[in-house]
A protein has these predicted regions:
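Extreme N-terminal starter segment of soluble prokaryotic enzymes
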Residues: 1-4
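Structural alpha/beta surface segment adjacent to cysteine/selenocysteine redox centers
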Residues: 16-114, 211-217
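Short, cysteine/histidine-rich loop/knuckle motifs that typically chelate Zn2+
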Residues: 13
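C-terminal cap of thioredoxin/glutaredoxin-like
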Residues: 6, 10, 18-26, 109-220
Length: 220
């Protein structure tokens, strides 16, 4: 079984979902494969001002009962034809073996807690390189973040996100070997996902048990 997490590094709702994501990975370690992919936001999805960003942060922070408010200091208007760098840098870090959460979490924390300008390539690269240490050289990381290969991967994962007929991040797509699929878009609470994962694992186990007793279905 696999769970794919679609995210945007600068998304506040993705920030709030991280404790739940960490709990899922710990609870189902060894039984479920976990992966994350970038789902780019559309131009109209971004806040248009820092004041508007703060309003969104007050809303999401209140909903999740956070004891702190996120920092909008990272905000800069997204210019036409450009995209904030943080997600590209996080994706590029995968090329250096950082396929876990550590680099994108460092970027998210720097932006949404410290207010650093993670939309700027040089800032995002510096933060990621510090988080990755000697295994993540800044010059090579920057080249990868600007590469056509990374852009193509992000475009492909974004297309996959929209192919599920969803628009809200975070999104979680659950799939298993017997063809079941569950899609959650915009939820940050643990319980709906654990209920679905438990049900799907139980079904897979039942199919496995049946096959051990009866084999494959007759050809005719």
């Amino acid at each position: 079984m696999k769970v794919t997490y679609f995210l945007e590094v600068t998304s506040s709702w993705c920030f709030w979902s991280e404790p739940m994501w960490a709990e899922l990975k710990a609870r189902y370690a060894g039984r479920v494969a976990f992966d994350w992919e970038i789902a780019k936001m559309l131009p109209g999805d971004w806040p248009v001002s820092r004041a508007q960003c703060d309003w969104f942060y007050r809303r999401s922070g209140t909903i999740v009962r956070s004891p702190f408010m996120l920092n909008s200091g990272w905000f800069e208007p997204v210019k036409p034809g450009t995209y904030p760098a943080a997600s590209y840098v996080a994706e590029a870090a995968k090329d250096f073996g950082f396929t876990g959460d550590e680099i994108r979490l460092a970027l998210s924390h720097a932006g949404e807690r410290e207010g650093q300008k993670i939309g700027r390539l040089e800032v995002a690269v510096a933060i990621a390189a510090q988080a990755g240490g000697k295994k993540l050289p800044a010059k090579k990381l920057r080249a990868a973040a600007e590469s056509k290969a990374v852009a193509a991967r992000i475009d492909a994962s974004t297309q996959e996100f929209f192919a599920h007929q969803i628009s809200q991040r975070p999104a979680f797509v659950l799939s298993d070997d017997i063809g079941d699929k569950a899609v959650f878009s915009g939820l940050v609470h643990l319980e709906p996902l654990t209920a679905a994962i438990d049900a799907m694992l139980a079904d897979v186990a039942a199919y496995t048990s049946f096959k051990s007793h009866h084999g494959n279905p007759p050809a005719r």
